[in-house]
Structure formats: structure tokens, C-alpha cells
Amino acid sequence: MERLLIVNADDFGLSKGQNYGIIEACRNGIVTSTTALVNGQAIDHAVQLSRDEPSLAIGMHFVLTMGKPLTVMPGLTRDGVLGKWIWQLAEEDALPLEEITQELASQYLRFIELFGRKPTHLDSHHHVHMFPQIFPIVAKFAAEEGIALRIDRQPLSNDGDLPANLRSSQGFSSAFYGEEISETLFLQVLDDSSHRGERSLEVMCHPAFVDNTIRQSAYCFPRLTELDVLTSASLKYAIAERGYLLGSYHDV
């Protein structure tokens, strides 16, 4: 039985090193899809590179934890910038949901301005779209726009409440991450999905070349290791051997 495998590289537009890593992992590896931060410092560079790589599917990486928002967000910013204090606001049930709704729409329109087309799908930086307060907003928006959505079903208490026309992969994994990156780990993710009977799977990754921006990230050198693994010829063969076809959210 053939299964769909989407290998999505997050953080397109974060930095030039990140952008080059994603393009390399697409051109010479198994990355089929990426998601772009429209407020990233290297987003224009990402747009330019993407023009020479038409096979790379591009979605939108909704950002509520980094950089400057596109709209005025007094309820979520400090000194005009976004940050990880969003977790505290979520715990206090104090998220400015109307502001978040407007920012989502603005980032979506900015994506279309930059890339000249709709994103293939939506996900988010640091998975904030899976917050219980935010998820219904993003799910409704994706369904209305006819685009797919990354769904990590583990935090969902009831995915029966999803919009009927919302598209997503059956499975999602963020396990290909950390200090123990290897081909074995990647293939274990596939085997676990197969055992669950999932016909489609998205695997999240972050391949990059290290530059000054990536050096400042808490997740730095493992991005290089990811790039090595994702461009391995033996991994591509092992994926096909397991009955997976590489694709994107266009195929969901």
C-alpha cells in the first residue's frame, strides 16, 4: 500500500543560512515542502530562491512568537515585538483572539503578495496554532480559504469538531528533532506511522547551514545534521522501500 510522505522544512525566511539549507535539502534530498515566515528577516531572499525551485511546495508559517507583527497587537507585543510570553498569556486565558485573527489574515495576504499565490497549507512557529484558544481560529480560516493545515492530533481533545472541508495529513511527527538526529530516527518515525495505519504523514524538519542568525538559536548545529541526513541517498531509497511516495499538501 502506497503512503504519502510530506517532508516539510519549517522556518523559510528565518535567515539566509536557513533558506540555503532548505533549498539544498529539496534539490538534493527528500524535502518536498516548506513553510515561510512572512515577517522573517530573510523572507525576500527566500522568495528569490524559491523562483528557481518550482518543485518546492510553500506554505505559511504563522508567527506569533518572534519579530514584529504586521498589525497593531498591543495585547500580544512588548515594545512592539512578539515573544514567547504568549505561553503565559495562554495559561492565563488572556490571549487577544481578535488581534490574532486579524494578524493571521494580514500574514496570509502578505504571503500572497510575496509569492504570488496562496500557500499550500498553514502551520505555525513554535506550534502556537495548536493552542486550544487559537486552533479554532486557524482551522476555520484554512477551511474557508481552501488550504490545508498541519494538525498535531495528540493535543486535540476531539478532532471530530474540525470543519468538514478542512484538509490535513492523517499523521504528523515532530520527532525528527534534537541532538540524536539520524537516518534510523527518521525511519522509525515512518515505521511508527505505518503501524498506526496512517495513509499520509508529515514529518517536520529544520535543515540549515549555520550563519550568525542560526548561531543565536537554541537549536543550532543539529540543523546541519538534519541537512546531512535529509540529503542521504540511502534514506531516499529506504523511504521508497517502505512504500512511501514523496509529495506535498497538494496531494492531500
UniProtKB/Swiss-Prot annotation:
Places the protein is found: Cytoplasm
Q: Which domain of life is it from?
A: Bacteria
Under InterPro entries, the record lists:
COD_ChbG_bac, Glyco_hydro/deAcase_b/a-brl, YdjC-like
tRNA processing recorded as keyword? no
Chief subcellular location: cytoplasm
State the coiled-coil residue ranges: none
Gene3D superfamilies membership: Glycoside hydrolase/deacetylase (3.20.20.370)
Return any one Pfam family short name.
Answer: YdjC
Q: Which cofactor does it need?
A: Mg(2+)
Q: How is this protein annotated for GO cellular component?
A: cytoplasm
Q: How does it assemble?
A: Homodimer.
Concerning NCBIfam families, the annotation shows: PRK02134.1
Q: What is this protein called?
A: Chitooligosaccharide deacetylase
Taxonomy of origin reads: Bacteria, Pseudomonadati, Pseudomonadota, Gammaproteobacteria, Enterobacterales
Q: Which gene encodes it?
A: chbG
